[in-house]
Design a protein with these regions (language model features):
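Structured beta->alpha junctions
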Residues: 64-66, 120, 157
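Predominant activation on well-ordered alpha-helical scaffold segments within soluble catalytic domains
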Residues: 25, 50, 129-136, 166-169
């Protein structure tokens, strides 16, 4: 049986941080905090994702459900319109953090002893980074058999979702 630390990313074993870790750090440092109020913005993370996907063969759209509430949808059309679609779904907002309750800056994105510290590093910015880079790299291959592959990076998951996935379901169901 593996110990809980057996699968920990060992930053010291690599000559430099991976692109996935660096992108996750950038997403954390953007501090797209969603406290459920009106002064919320996922624009920094959404715009960073748009920059990552720029230049791919994907059909890329973004939707602003409200000022600052941007969701990004990228689609790679498949070769079989009857095949199921694969959706990679993530959210770009995080819940608030009380800095006094943290051992490190919750929005510092530091790697210390092989651990990435930061609000959203697990839920769900590391997944957003990894999925986005995998999608970008898959798009670069230029071979898209089967059904469509969709990357959906939504705003407002941490509160009600009404300005993220809920808004997309109502206004952009395709």
């Amino acid at each position: 049986m593996l110990s809980p630390r057996a699968s920990v990313y060992d930053a010291g074993a690599l000559p430099a941080l991976t692109e996935e870790v660096e992108l996750t750090q950038a997403l954390i440092r953007n501090a797209c905090v969603n406290d459920g109020g009106t002064n919320v913005s996922e624009l920094p993370n959404a715009d960073l994702m748009l920059a990552i996907l720029d230049g791919t063969t994907a059909d890329i759209e973004y939707f602003d459900a409200a000022p600052g509430r941007r969701s990004v949808i990228a689609r790679l059309p498949g070769t079989d319109s009857t095949a199921p679609t694969l959706m990679l779904l993530g959210h770009t907002d995080v819940v608030p953090a009380n800095p006094d309750a943290w051992q490190r800056d919750p929005f510092g994105g530091e790697v210390v002893d092989g651990f990435l510290w930061g609000r959203g590093s697990l839920d769900m910015l590391s997944y957003v980074a990894t999925m986005s880079l995998a999608f970008r790299d898959y798009a670069a291959q230029g071979i898209h058999r089967g059904g469509d592959v969709v990357l959906a990076l939504v705003a407002d998951e941490e509160a009600l979702g009404s300005q993220g996935m809920g808004w997309l379901q109502e206004h952009e169901p395709d």
